[in-house]
UniProtKB/Swiss-Prot annotation:
Disulfide-bonded cysteines: 5-55, 14-38, 30-51
Molecular function per GO: serine-type endopeptidase inhibitor activity
Domain of life: Eukaryota
Subcellular location: Secreted; Nematocyst
One GO location term (cellular component): nematocyst
Function text: Serine protease inhibitor that inhibits both tissue and plasma kallikreins. Has hemolytic activity. Inhibits voltage-gated potassium channels.
Protein known as: KappaPI-actitoxin-Avd3a
Pfam families: Kunitz_BPTI
Family affiliation: Belongs to the venom Kunitz-type family. Sea anemone type 2 potassium channel toxin subfamily.
Organism in which the protein naturally occurs: Anemonia sulcata (Mediterranean snakelocks sea anemone)
Annotated SMART domains: KU
Amino acid sequence: INGDCELPKVVGPCRARFPRYYYNSSSKRCEKFIYGGCGGNANNFHTLEECEKVCGVRSVGR
């Protein structure tokens, strides 16, 4: 797994509401979260597909 995928989800201090995806190392899945727009980390992807590709998630049912 890419090291960025092990980072915790960070919403950040700003108040924007961007739908993003992050890799949840507990569930071993990419999950949606709302990103505030600043102060995040590299575990922050624009699409579910990008998150799964970078973090090596095997999608169920595909």
